[in-house]
Amino acid sequence: LFQMDNYTDTIMLFEAAAMGEQNPLTAMMTATAYNVDNFETMASDLAVYCERTIPLSTGAQKAVQLVPFSYARYWHGYLIWLRPLLCVMSITGVRVVQYLVLFALLAVILWQLRRQCGLRAMVWFAVSQLAVTVFWVPHQVQYFTTFCIAYAGCAWVLARPRRAGQLSIALVVLGTCTAFCDLLVTPIITLGLPVAVWLCCLPQRAASGARQCLPVIGGSLCWGAGYAMCWGLKWVLATLITGRSEEH
């Protein structure tokens, strides 16, 4: 994560600030927001978007014509928690909350790894997260969303020994949650991290190569099925409810 995904975060913030006269169901399906051409002017663009006016040098206000854009192919599940938080705090406060949540989950995972898999597994997991600069993840809403889902999956896997069938069911849920919340930026992390920590557990380490590979392949297919079904369902519902088959 050596580059901040400000463009995607800008889209998320504009979706959170979206205003319109559509009924809630149609608004959820269309996910209409203001079209952003330059994420570097996000602060001023958000002010214009919310006020729908531009201040003039004379002190008067000039009405602006907003250009709508629909992100109808995504569920935008992150709005379930982002909108309420933005009602009571600024984006800086949201980032503080994200830091607290993510590093609390990381602490739980490291403790579970130490207990279930040993000190070496815990250290290498911590090193891997530092290698991807996890300390910057909560600074971005987009990265936080997928890392939070992935860490929650890791915590569930490590809570007690899990059979391959249980892992596959969990990966269906993780794939569905990822499609519901993610904007197709870092989805695969919600598959890779839970599977990696599952393989670190003692029963899997003692298994033969085939007994390790087959659950991973099957679990990956389950994750993909959950992701595809959730994402495809949004396309179908958005088309049926809005009468449009593409974003605009």
Provide a role label for each language-model segment.
Residues 2-71:
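Interfacial juxtamembrane loops and adjacent helix segments
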Residues 225-244:
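Transmembrane-lumen/periplasm boundary regions of multi-pass, lipid-linked membrane glycan transferases
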Residues 73, 80-98:
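Juxtamembrane segments of multi-pass membrane glycosylation machinery
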Residues 167-194, 215-230:
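Membrane-interface alpha helices of multi-pass inner-membrane proteins
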Residues 99-123:
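Transmembrane-helix motifs of polytopic, lipid-linked glycan transferases
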Residues 153-158, 189-221:
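Perimembrane helix-loop-helix junctions
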Residues 248:
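Conserved small/polar residues in nucleotide/adenosyl-binding loops
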Residues 75, 127-166, 180-187:
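Membrane-interface micro-motifs in multi-pass membrane enzymes
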